[in-house]
Amino acid sequence: MGNVFIHATMTLDGYIADVNSSVDWMNDLVATDKDYEVANKVAANVGAVVGGANKTNTIEEGEVPYGGTIKMPVFLMTHTPTDPIEKDGMTYTFVVDDIAQAVEAAKAAAGDKDVALLGGTISRQCLKLGLVDEIVLDVEPLLLGDGISLFGGLGETIKLERIDTSAFAAETHMRYRVIK
């Protein structure tokens, strides 16, 4: 069975979106071939994704995890029972209120591959429950000053072990193991 990991692109000051929940700042980023190589290596081993309820809106607007380059099951947290959505060869399954259940379903669907956690709230909840094995961050050379923090409000100390770090012209890529 693969790892459960947080995967996020964030600014140097720790934000994954601006104060309006927008990630438009990502449109101006310039990645190098080496950056794409690192991202593709991570994405290639993802077998399922767990995201928050906010992802439902972005999916309805056309966004898909990993740009649709890989087809995988997606499990989205919600407070309201919702039928699965089939879109562009991917199945979006909605799980009501139980993040541990969503992660277990994603692990079963992923088989030997990894499960990626996308979004700040989901990431913090999974860290608190001890469900996260690794954290993979792509840090952009940008300061937003305010916005939605990836780890803000976590409320506890989580010890990490650095697995890998690489830096190219555009991004710094960091991978950490969560010490349990």
Q: Can you describe what each PLM-predicted range is?
A:
Residues M1-K180:
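Enzymes that bind and transform nitrogen-containing heteroaromatic metabolites
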